[in-house]
Structure formats: C-alpha cells, structure tokens
Swiss-Prot record:
EC number: 4.2.1.59
Keywords, sorted A to Z: Cytoplasm, Lipid A biosynthesis, Lipid biosynthesis, Lipid metabolism, Lyase
Organism the protein comes from: Synechococcus sp. (strain ATCC 27144 / PCC 6301 / SAUG 1402/1)
SUPFAM superfamilies named in the record: Thioesterase/thiol ester dehydrase-isomerase
Enzyme class: lyase
Stated name of the protein: 3-hydroxyacyl-[acyl-carrier-protein] dehydratase FabZ
Active site, UniProt feature: 61
C-alpha cells in the first residue's frame, strides 16, 4: 500500500504532537491527541491523550468533580482516525468532518490524570470522500468509550 504523495511523509513512530499538527487541522483547545504510538497505513492507528486538570473544559464540567465530556472523547477518537484518513493512498486532501456518529457508548468516566489510549480501525472508504472507522478509548486497560465514526470530505 502506498502513502498519498501529497500527504506529509510518515516519520518514525511515535509521532509527536508537532507531527500530528502537520497532519490534522486541529489546534488548542481542540488538538486532543498527544502522540501516535502505532500506525498501519490505510488500516489502523493508536494514539495517546494525556488528560490534565488544566484543560479548559474542567472549569465547568463539573466544578468539584471534573469529568472529560463524552463529546471530547469521541472527538479524540476521531482525530486518531483522521491520521489514518489523511495518510490514505489516493485520498484527496481536504477537510474531513463528521458525517455520522453511530453506536457510541460510554463505559467509564475519564478524569484528570487518566491517559486515554485511543484506537481507530478503518472499516470502509467510499468514493474517495466518505470513511468509517471503529474507535475505542481505553483507560488503564478498561474500555471508556467506543463507537463508529463516519467522516465526509468538505470541498
């Protein structure tokens, strides 16, 4: 399998945050992946998100009992999936956004101090503009969240 010639060259793993920023458009406070630790072109990727107390969402979600919002866990899974899609062979460059979020389940709370291990597996890619991934978020070997995420290319 070849890598998209227009995409940045894939350096040696792990991919640091600076490399991830070269692949994804997200920036603070929505850059939610700190490192990519595993990557198989066109198939899967595994990333790390270190959850810290000084993140802005914890000011209001919830005072005295901070919990990472589920929507941000889903977004973090999607960003790991975005690494797969961005580096896929023959995939046009552009902005991929959510087209669907299916069968998402939250199994345990994610709190400051946790390390999310985010895995994304490519399920399908259609017409060079739609991709579906299966995402999982784990903390200490326990499933925190999972679901299917669908992306669409915005022109």
């Amino acid at each position: 399998m070849t890598v998209n010639p227009d995409a940045p060259a894939l350096p040696t793993l792990p991919l640091a945050v600076e490399t991830i920023q070269g692949l994804l458009p997200h920036r603070y406070p929505f850059a939610l992946v700190d490192r990519i630790i595993d990557y198989v072109p066109g198939e899967r990727a595994v990333g790390i998100k270190n959850v810290t107390f000084n993140e802005p969402q914890f000011q209001g979600h919830f005072p005295g009992r901070p919990l990472m919002p589920g929507v941000l866990i889903v977004e973090a899974m999607a960003q790991v999936g975005g690494v797969i899609v961005t580096l896929m062979p023959d995939m046009p460059q552009g902005l991929f956004v959510f087209a669907g979020i299916d069968q998402v389940r939250f199994r345990r709370p994610v709190v400051p101090g946790d390390q999310l291990v985010l895995s994304a597996q490519l399920l399908s890619a259609k017409r060079r503009r739609f991709c579906k991934i299966q995402g999982e978020a784990m903390v200490d070997g326990q499933l925190a969240a999972s679901g299917e995420l669908v992306f669409s290319l915005v022109e």
